[in-house]
From Swiss-Prot:
This is Probable cytosol aminopeptidase. It comes from Exiguobacterium sibiricum (strain DSM 17290 / CCUG 55495 / CIP 109462 / JCM 13490 / 255-15). It comes from the Bacteria. It is an enzyme of class 3 (hydrolase). GO terms for cellular component: cytoplasm. CDD domains: Peptidase_M17. The keyword Cytoplasm applies. The lineage of its organism: Bacteria, Bacillati, Bacillota, Bacilli, Bacillales. Mn(2+) 1 binds at residues 250, 327, 329.
Length: 477
């Protein structure tokens, strides 16, 4: 996708404009349809109803066609409503293979240039496939008429690109996106943007005593990786640590998943994808903040060496864990990753994981579940998600749940107290390793993928939380 800003007098193939039921049409748009526009609006040939689209040829040579986007009553249009209008318009153009497009941002409320660039990038994303019959990709060339500077376009395009990177990773099959391949993806990002990168190998983990991460990896023939990225934009300030679960395929181990539940487990590294998407955005936009990214990467397989229910393992923090469910593996890899992140003395820790099926039961597929030990941290993050429309909902992090995680006859903790309240148990387990550090846990198991296409993209991976994470860390500088 290419973005340009040029003189409005240039020749235009398709011009996208907003049209409202209670605001006059700008004269330069009216001039394209001498003595006709008001009549067409009056009889419904051009609709001002919110979400209605009309593509019409013009009566002049400067602009070939105009796509009218109905805004309804413009003052009642929310940011997310506007986002979905742009997404619908972008997909309308894509369906007709109209690739050279000019958008008159001045006809939309507040000239939302960043939102236009972001949404066009998100909504026209194409899922990578591995079919032998290739297809032509939609190569969009967009020009914006606006008083806003290029920086707004760059921000929106960068956030869309970063989100789409996360989408691509979540979609990749587990035989191609192994732990070493995920480490390579991190290396590509680090080299492209100059981030600091460290990759811990299995021997390094053994030396550090990462028994929880290593236990999950025991059944695999593919070695684990602990991926550590650093973005330094604020000197010696303490970093914000972002930890993403990177289980590249999850069989459930000996607590094996059913045949329907195991399909799609290539996407059990959605948290890791969000972290890498964040670092892609940081590299493009360079805010004045320090960010640490930690990704524990492994698959969870079955073999004669795999860990088992009733095993007792020792984490990097020294806490012992009774294994009651080998399919509760995400919290184990996060435990060691969070412990490692604390070595950097971060000002806060945010972890993201496709952690539990329980969050889908509780909140469905539109809302991410959250736990926290810091109300202010949650409130600041929630405020950001209301702008990005990546909704979160805080679940109770209270003693009644914490005590059940600590209930074991043979170890300090157990990894799966039961199914009732399962989402909270998963987060509370991770909370046992954060100590007093301000911490936010995000369970994205319901929001990491969508079962049907929307105005913001095709079915499948969503790249959830990339945009919210970026806006949050930028404001925490």
């Amino acid at each position: 996708m290419r973005w340009n800003q040029v003189d409005p007098q240039a020749h235009v193939e398709v011009l996208v404009v907003g049209i409202s039921g209670n605001q006059p049409v700008e004269e330069r748009i009216r001039s394209l349809y001498p003595d006709r526009l008001d009549e067409w609006v009056r009889r419904g040939d051009i609709s001002t109803k919110q979400g209605e689209l009309r593509l019409l040829p013009t009566l002049t040579g400067t602009v070939e066609r105009v796509l009218f986007v109905g805004l309804g009553k413009a003052e009642g249009l929310t940011t997310d409503g506007l986002r979905r209008l742009f997404g619908k318009a972008a997909q309308f153009l894509k369906a007709r293979q109209l690739s050279k497009v000019t958008i008159d941002a001045t006809t939309f409320p507040d000239q939302p240039v960043e939102l236009i660039a972001e949404t066009f990038g998100l909504s026209t994303y194409e899922v990578k496939h591995y079919k032998t019959n290739t297809r032509a990709t939609y190569d969009l060339d967009v020009t914006i008429w606006s008083d806003a500077g290029e920086q707004a376009v760059e921000r929106g395009a960068a956030l869309a690109q970063a989100t789409n990177l996360a989408r691509r990773l979540v979609t990749m099959p587990g035989n191609l996106l192994t732990a070493p391949a995920l480490a390579d993806e991190a290396r590509f990002i680090a080299e492209r943007h100059g981030h600091e990168l460290k990759i811990l190998e299995k021997a390094d983990m053994e030396a550090l005593g990462m028994g929880a991460l290593l236990a999950v990896n025991q059944g695999s023939t593919i070695p684990p990786k602990l991926i550590v990225l650093e973005y330094k934009g604020a000197g010696d300030d303490a970093p914000i640590a972002v930890v993403g679960k990177g289980v590249t395929f999850d069989t459930g181990g000996y607590s094996i998943k059913p045949k329907d539940g195991i399909v799609g487990m290539k996407g059990d590294m959605g948290g890791a994808a969000a972290v890498l998407g964040l670092f892609e955005a940081l590299g493009h936009l360079k805010p004045n903040v320090n960010v640490l990214g930690v990704i524990p990467a492994t698959d969870n397989m079955i073999s004669g060496d795999a860990f088992k229910p009733d095993d007792v393992i020792t984490s990097m923090a020294g806490k012992t864990i009774e294994i009651l469910n080998t399919d509760a593996e995400g919290r184990l890899v996060l435990a060691d990753a969070v412990t490692y992140a604390k070595e950097y003395k971060p000002k806060m820790i945010i972890d993201l994981a496709t952690l539990t099926g329980g969050v889908l039961v509780a909140l469905g597929t539109e809302i991410t579940g959250a736990l926290t030990n810091d109300a202010g941290l949650y409130e600041r993050f929630e405020a950001v998600t209301k702008e990005t429309n990546e909704m979160v909902w805080q679940m109770p992090y209270v003693d009644q749940f914490i005590k059940q995680v600590r209930r074991s006859d043979v170890a300090d903790l157990n990894n799966s107290p039961g199914r009732m309240g399962h989402m909270i148990f998963g987060g509370a387990f991770v909370g046992e390793f954060v100590g007093d550090t301000p911490w936010l846990h995000l369970d994205i198991a319901g929001t990491s993928e969508q079962k049907a296409a929307t105005e913001l993209g095709p079915k499948g991976a969503t790249g959830v939380m990339v945009r919210s994470l970026y806006h949050f860390v930028e404001r925490e500088k």
